[in-house]
């Protein structure tokens, strides 16, 4: 069984016991998060698409950790001007383990 959820402006295809990194959520490590924006659910019976969401469907996940992605380097240079700027950015993410998909 799989589901497609929407969180943080992105869509993720999830299966039970999958580990995924999503945009930062305000949740402590070890807590449970429930997603109600389920866009599609699939299994042996076929695929159910939502319009725009599947009514009554939820996906529950456990927060493993709050983390940051690798550094993305931003380097700007103006030629012949001895002008350069180097900056870095680390995007905060939440690491989740999907514990269950409820099709209801």
Swiss-Prot record:
This protein binds to 23S rRNA in the presence of protein L20. GO terms for cellular component: cytoplasm; ribonucleoprotein complex; ribosome. It comes from Acidiphilium cryptum (strain JF-5). PANTHER family: 50S RIBOSOMAL PROTEIN L21, LARGE RIBOSOMAL SUBUNIT PROTEIN BL21M. Part of the 50S ribosomal subunit. Contacts protein L20. One of its GO terms (biological process) is translation. This is Large ribosomal subunit protein bL21. Belongs to the bacterial ribosomal protein bL21 family. InterPro entries: bL21-like (IPR028909), bL21-like_sf (IPR036164), Ribosomal_bL21 (IPR001787). Keywords: Ribonucleoprotein, Ribosomal protein, RNA-binding, rRNA-binding. One of its GO terms (molecular function) is rRNA binding. The keyword Kinase does not apply.
